[in-house]
A protein has these predicted regions:
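Extracytoplasmic/periplasmic cell wall- or extracellular glycan-interacting regions that localize
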Residues: 1-69, 73-75, 127-139
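Well-ordered beta-strand positions in beta-sheet-rich domains
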Residues: 40, 71, 81-83, 116-118
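Conserved beta-strand positions that form and line the central face of beta-propeller blades
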Residues: 42, 73, 83-86, 106
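Short strand-connecting beta-turns/loops that link adjacent beta-strands
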Residues: 67, 78-79, 112, 124
Length: 139
């Protein structure tokens, strides 16, 4: 049983920084090609752009996942998890602590695959809409 999970008090992130400078191309809940709905946000990125961590956390996974490029999974302080996907490569390792805004990798150069970065936030394993925590970029 998973009864013990019910006693865990989760604290949502106070805010999330955009992983890359770029427009949001797909929002949470929007229909996606092939069926289903988006579980996160997709940002347009400049080819080869540096991607930064949207929040402070600890790297739980860093590596390639078929169809998603290189992904990062962070465990945030409040018990939430954050997934960053679509990276070309990362500059962090499992177990490493990262700060909000810290560079963690690079977007693709755009030749092989679109320079898009995907952001997903999970609450006890279920995707939730990151928009409510997105810090508005000034400018």
């Amino acid at each position: 049983g998973r009864m013990a999970d019910d006693t865990v008090v989760l604290t949502p992130p106070a805010r999330l920084a955009q992983p890359v400078d770029g427009a949001i191309q797909r929002r949470f809940g929007e229909p996606i090609a092939g069926g289903g709905r988006a579980n996160g946000l997709t940002f347009a990125a400049e080819p080869g752009a540096r991607a930064v961590s949207p929040a402070t956390g600890v790297v739980q996974y860093a590596g390639p996942v078929k169809g998603w490029g290189v992904i990062l999974i962070l465990r945030l302080a409040g018990g939430y998890h954050l997934v960053l996907a679509g990276l070309e490569r990362t500059s962090v390792q499992v177990g490493q602590s990262v700060a909000e805004g810290q560079p963690v990798g690079w977007a693709p150069d755009g030749r092989q695959s679109a320079a898009e970065i995907y952001l997903e936030v999970r609450e006890q394993g279920s995707p939730v809409d990151p928009m409510k925590w997105m810090r508005k970029r000034v400018g």
